[in-house]
Amino acid sequence: MSGEFPSAFLFPDPALADKEGLLCFGGDLEPSTLLAAYSQGIFPWFNAGDPILWWSPHPRFLLFPSELQFSRRTQKRLEQCAFEVRADERFKEVIGGCQKAVRKNQEGTWILPKIVKAYEHLFEEGYAHSLEVYKEGELVGGLYGVSLGAAFFGESMFSRQDHASKAAIRELCRLGVERGWKMIDCQIHSEHLERWGARAVDRERFLVLLKEALKEKTWRGRWSLN
């Protein structure tokens, strides 16, 4: 799977990851390395002072676009909020919003300057994408991730107003259904994503789904929402 994205850094078999999901460390964050990693079900995640750490957790947390579940109350609230969602207009601001977001039980951020730079390069190459959520012209939320074949790898999201991140996820799933995505990779478990319909899939099954997804067209370049 990594043949399409030659990298000087060769990744081990994802099955060799430890029980926490840590597979290896080192390498770089060049676009070719990141794409080779994603195509093998591997992603970077590390804190300041750490080497570059690469992960392939078991189980994997996935959201299938057609399985998004919002309560009637949430759906009603989203309609009342009347958010506008756009794509790939303010990638740098979206990743910056994710970087600054305060998260429960988390000190600081793993979205370090080198991560920001790496994903900005992927955006320039047409593989990383952002969804921006607006309220009365103001950016109030969004998400970003990587698109390869019929898979979207979600990296992070933020919300400055209640329900803004839900609007981003809803639009992402709508786009996924429209484009025939096999899955949205959420990487690791989170309670709110589980409430929205995401579920755990064992690594072997995830890698089979990924292999199938990579046979499909990659929606590379700037996205425009209908």
UniProtKB/Swiss-Prot annotation:
GO biological process, one term: protein catabolic process
Reaction equations catalysed: N-terminal L-lysyl-[protein] + L-leucyl-tRNA(Leu) = N-terminal L-leucyl-L-lysyl-[protein] + tRNA(Leu) + H(+); N-terminal L-arginyl-[protein] + L-leucyl-tRNA(Leu) = N-terminal L-leucyl-L-arginyl-[protein] + tRNA(Leu) + H(+); L-phenylalanyl-tRNA(Phe) + an N-terminal L-alpha-aminoacyl-[protein] = an N-terminal L-phenylalanyl-L-alpha-aminoacyl-[protein] + tRNA(Phe)
GO CC terms: cytoplasm
Gene3D superfamilies: Leucyl/phenylalanyl-tRNA-protein transferase, C-terminal domain, Leucyl/phenylalanyl-tRNA-protein transferase, N-terminal domain
Keywords assigned by UniProt, alphabetized: Acyltransferase, Cytoplasm, Transferase
Family designation: Belongs to the L/F-transferase family.
PANTHER family assigned to the protein according to its UniProt record, in alphabetical order: LEUCYL/PHENYLALANYL-TRNA--PROTEIN TRANSFERASE, LEUCYL_PHENYLALANYL-TRNA--PROTEIN TRANSFERASE
Annotated function: Functions in the N-end rule pathway of protein degradation where it conjugates Leu, Phe and, less efficiently, Met from aminoacyl-tRNAs to the N-termini of proteins containing an N-terminal arginine or lysine.
Enzyme Commission no: 2.3.2.6
Name of the protein: Leucyl/phenylalanyl-tRNA--protein transferase
Molecular function, one GO term: leucyl-tRNA--protein transferase activity
